[in-house]
Amino acid sequence: MPLPDFHVSEPFTLGIELEMQVVNPPGYDLSQDSSMLIDTVKNQITAGEVKHDITESMLELATDVCRDINQAAGQFSAMQKVVLQAAADHHLEICGGGTHPFQKWQRQEVCDNERYQRTLENFGYLIQQATVFGQHVHVGCASGDDAIYLLHGLSRFVPHFIALSAASPYMQGTDTRFASSRPNIFSAFPDNGPMPWVSNWQQFEALFRCLSYTTMIDSIKDLHWDIRPSPHFGTVEVRVMDTPLTLSHAVNMAGLIQATAHWLLTERPFKHQEKDYLMYKFNRFQACRYGLEGVITDPHTGDRRSLTEATLRLLEKIAPSAHKIGASSAIEALHRQVVSGLNEAQLMRDFVADGGSLIGLVKKHCEIWAGE
């Protein structure tokens, strides 16, 4: 399928996707019932969409195009209410978190969807292992060239986004010692990590043509980069965050990305170059492994800085942009989180350290999601 022209969209508009866990009490393992839930709620959703993801234990909640985080929060809240009622009617529960702490990938059923079945054919067991749960944020752009500039600008802050959203310390019944273990699942995919370097939209079109020769790439959706342009929506999509345990944190993360995009495209503070990516995977690893306690390295100067310090600097830089787009509450909440030193991964570990089981941890996550 050829790459579509870049669809011009209103700059800085938002679209947010949350991949949720469908679990089966009282054992709180992943259920295989997302199709049943989707059929139940499909005529009750008035704004946004509830849809499939890769496997039957995943339920995606997606907003419509939103002008700001308040509109997105309203749509999510309405969807949450409908989904929770449908889940209760079927004796199921819903929760966030980037991984389910003890599910076995071999049990996961790939959805009966042509694209997912084709992906299963291409990637085999890797697709079942990709039963992990992330938050994706789309930001509108006025042109393809703006999208490429924005993608490179946001890529500088991938470690910050990972560290702030880290919520996947447990996997396959084990403490991984990572704050965010979810991104590691994709390391075997040939398109893992950053997009190959291009400097404008014309070069991106040439890149896509080249990748399509592999026969594994039929559309932009088949590319699993950390950040990718979405020409059919006219957006740049950030894909590195774990699904948070609460809607409020998900909305705050979206506000952070929206405000950062506003700052990048209005101030144009960087002249991007390929060398910007020299330390990308090392800095990304630091964020996944240590969260805000990680240390990132500047590829140009060699300077090293903790992610706590770097994130506070980012929040300060984008505060004026956040004010202009109505996202100040998100930046203030994230500032409090960074200063407190707490993140969801550590809260999960604290629960287990205090004697809680992994089954009890999932139960707690369901209570958090339902109780907000």
Swiss-Prot record:
Reaction(s) catalysed by this chain's protein: L-cysteine + L-glutamate + ATP = gamma-L-glutamyl-L-cysteine + ADP + phosphate + H(+)
E.C. numbers: 6.3.2.2
Annotated keywords: ATP-binding, Ligase, Nucleotide-binding
Coiled coil region boundaries: none
Lineage top rank: taxon: Bacteria
Any one GO BP annotation for this protein: modified amino acid biosynthetic process
EC class (word): ligase
Gene Ontology MF terms: ATP binding; glutamate-cysteine ligase activity
Record-linked Pfam families: GCS2
SUPFAM superfamilies assigned: Glutamine synthetase/guanido kinase
TM stretches of this protein: none
Quaternary organization: Homodimer.
Family: Belongs to the glutamate--cysteine ligase type 2 family. YbdK subfamily.
Purpose of the protein: ATP-dependent carboxylate-amine ligase which exhibits weak glutamate--cysteine ligase activity.
UniProt xrefs under PANTHER family: GLUTAMATE--CYSTEINE LIGASE 2-RELATED
NCBIfam families: gshA_cyan_rel, PRK13516.1
HAMAP family to which the protein is assigned, alphabetical: Glu_cys_ligase_2
Protein name: Putative glutamate--cysteine ligase 2
Organism: Escherichia coli O81 (strain ED1a)
